[in-house]
Amino acid sequence: MSFAPLQNDTFLRACRRQATDYTPLWLMRQAGRYLPEYKATRARAGSFMGLATNVDYATEVTLQPLERFPLDAAILFSDILTVPDAMGLGLSFAEGEGPRFARVVRDEAAVAELAVPDMEKLRYVFDAVTSIRRALDGRVPLIGFSGSPWTLACYMVEGSGSDDYRLVKTLMYSRPDLMHRILAINADAVAAYLNAQIDAGAQAVMVFDSWGGVLADGAFQEFSLAYTTRVLAQLKRTGVDGTDVPRIVFTKGGALWLEDMKGLDCEVLGLDWTANLARARALVGGAVGGPGKALQGNIDPNVLFAPPEAIAAQARAVLDRFGAPHTDRGTTGPTHIFNLGHGISQHTPPEHVAALVEAVHGHSRAMRAAAGTGRA
C-alpha cells in the first residue's frame, strides 16, 4: 500500500518533539455539525450511522474542514462506540438523544459473552482510513482514534451517556472483578482496532479517555490508566509507509494526574481547558535534548462563541502560557499542538474557527521570530 508523499509534516514533527516553523493546529470534532456542508452530507446519508459506515461519505466529511481552514491534520470521521457495536451491543443514534446500546453489560452473564470482535466487522472503518488517506493526497497527516477502555465501558454499562455514571461506578465498586474483565477485553479490542487503522494508513493514533476524569483518585489509576497502558503496549510503532506512528492520549479532566500519565508509553498528552499549560510543560514536557511528552490543547471550546478579536486574544494567551517554543532543529524539546480542550460545539460559527486558526498560526510564527529563528 503506497500513498502520496506528505507535504505538511508540522503536526507529526510536533508529536515527535521536533522544532516546527509554527504551532500546528487541528480540532477535536473538526468534521461535524457546525459546518453546513456536513449537515448536507448527513442529510444525504439519512442517519449518523449511515454516514459513518459509508466510505465515500466518511471521506467527504473528513475532508470538509480542510477545504475551509488551513488545519495541520485530518482526523478520521467515525465514532468511539464502533468497537462495542462490533461486540454485538447494538449501537443506535436517536435524533437529539445521542448514542444508545440495545444491550448493556451489567452482570456476569453479559460479561461472559464479551469478546474482542472480529475486526472484519469494522472493515468500513479501515476502508475509510485508506480512502481518506488517498483523498488527502499528502496534504496533511491522518489521525486514527478509539475510545479508551474505561470510556467504552461507561457506555457499555450505562447503555448511553450519563450525568452521574451511577451504574458503571456501582459495578466498579461492588464487582471490581467484573469491571476488570470488561476493561481487559476492551483494551485488547482497542489495540487491535487501532493497529488495523495503522495498517490501513493512519499516521498517528489517539486514545480518547473522555470520561477518565469522572473517577476518584486511585480509581483512575486502577480502572482507566492501567488499561490505557495495556492498549499502548500492544500498538504498532511503524505505519504502512515505514515511518513511526505517534500515539496521543487525551483524558478529559485528567490534569490532576499528569505525573501519573508522564509514564505512559505515548508521544503526546492531550489536555482539557482546566489544565495549566505552563505547569504541564514543566511536569511532562521535558527539556531540550531530553525525554518528555508533546502537549496538545487546550483552549475552552466556548471561547469560539466570543467575537473574533476575543478569540484571537485567548488563542495568543494559550500559546503564551505554553511559552517560548523549542526551535533547535538539531534536537528534540518541548512542543505544543494547538487544539480545543474538548470537542467543538455544533453551534460554533465557522468564521470563528477561521479566526482561531489565523491567530494560532500568526502568533506562533511571531513567537518563533522573536526567539531569533529567522523563520517567521
From Swiss-Prot:
UniProt subcellular location: Cytoplasm
InterPro entries, per the entry: UROD/MetE-like_sf, Uroporphyrinogen_deCO2ase_HemE, Uroporphyrinogen_deCOase
Superkingdom of origin organism: Bacteria
Site (Transition state stabilizer): 79
Known EC number: 4.1.1.37
Pathway the protein acts in: Porphyrin-containing compound metabolism; protoporphyrin-IX biosynthesis; coproporphyrinogen-III from 5-aminolevulinate: step 4/4
Keywords recorded for this protein, A-Z: Cytoplasm, Decarboxylase, Lyase, Porphyrin biosynthesis
MF term (GO), any: uroporphyrinogen decarboxylase activity
A Pfam family reported for this protein in Swiss-Prot or TrEMBL: URO-D
Name of the top EC class for this enzyme: lyase
UniProt GO BP: protoporphyrinogen IX biosynthetic process from glutamate
Family stated for the protein in its record: Belongs to the uroporphyrinogen decarboxylase family.
Subunit: Homodimer.
Protein function: Catalyzes the decarboxylation of four acetate groups of uroporphyrinogen-III to yield coproporphyrinogen-III.
Identification of the protein by name: Uroporphyrinogen decarboxylase
Organism: Paracidovorax citrulli (strain AAC00-1) (Acidovorax citrulli)
